[in-house]
Amino acid sequence: MYPNSRYILPSLDERTAYGYKQVDPYTKLFEDRIVFLGVQIDDASADDVMAQLLVLEGQDAERDIIMYINSPGGSFTAMTAIYDTMQYIRPQIQTVCLGQAASAAAVILSAGTPGKRLALPNARILIHQPVVASSGYGQASDIEIQAREIMRMREWLEKTLAQHSNKSVKQVSKDIDRDKILSSEQALEYGLIDQILVSRKAGLGKK
């Protein structure tokens, strides 16, 4: 049994005017205006992503930001925080799905700048209705409040996915009743992405 099965990120030695400094791959990506969302979406990861987006806007509001996504999804409210920040800042955002963009991460993928939402050939995109943990206990009025909030979240999700795809709200509502798993080709047809990237060697990819 391995004591630590997680891949260890290498550090890079970089020469500066003050000598050498060690940086990790994520720092190098950030220097190239790349934000990597590779974890579950929760309050902590949302804060990290929002901070990076705001800093990059402050550095240059005219240059694009690239967001790579490989995430199983997560918190609805954390997702909406990232979503609102993406809509708020001035730079255009290219979103690229590597691996998977499930649940909340699928919304983030679709919210990239139109024409700049991409996925690799074997990427997996999953959409479904909001999932909210509930004990099922409490006063009737509290349960009613929770039910109304769940419906509000679902309505927001339906309208938002319809806005960022080529489907109607009615169709999205039907599709998210159960897990809907899309290949990159299916996500392209659905309108959640604009292009499939095959290889940098072959150019941008295919429509």
From Swiss-Prot:
Keywords: Cytoplasm, Hydrolase, Protease, Serine protease. GO terms for cellular component: cytoplasm; endopeptidase Clp complex. Belongs to the peptidase S14 family. InterPro entries: ClpP, ClpP/crotonase-like_dom_sf, ClpP/TepA, ClpP_His_AS, ClpP_Ser_AS. HAMAP family: ClpP. One of its GO terms (molecular function) is ATPase binding. This is ATP-dependent Clp protease proteolytic subunit 1. PANTHER family: ATP-DEPENDENT CLP PROTEASE PROTEOLYTIC SUBUNIT, ATP-DEPENDENT CLP PROTEASE PROTEOLYTIC SUBUNIT-LIKE-RELATED. It holds the Pfam family CLP_protease. It comes from the Bacteria. SUPFAM superfamilies: ClpP/crotonase. Cleaves peptides in various proteins in a process that requires ATP hydrolysis. Has a chymotrypsin-like activity. Plays a major role in the degradation of misfolded proteins. The active site is at 103 (nucleophile), 128. Fourteen ClpP subunits assemble into 2 heptameric rings which stack back to back to give a disk-like structure with a central cavity, resembling the structure of eukaryotic proteasomes. Its EC number is 3.4.21.92. Its main location: cytoplasm. GO terms for biological process: protein quality control for misfolded or incompletely synthesized proteins. It catalyses: Hydrolysis of proteins to small peptides in the presence of ATP and magnesium. alpha-casein is the usual test substrate. In the absence of ATP, only oligopeptides shorter than five residues are hydrolyzed (such as succinyl-Leu-Tyr-|-NHMec, and Leu-Tyr-Leu-|-Tyr-Trp, in which cleavage of the -Tyr-|-Leu- and -Tyr-|-Trp bonds also occurs). It is found in: Cytoplasm.
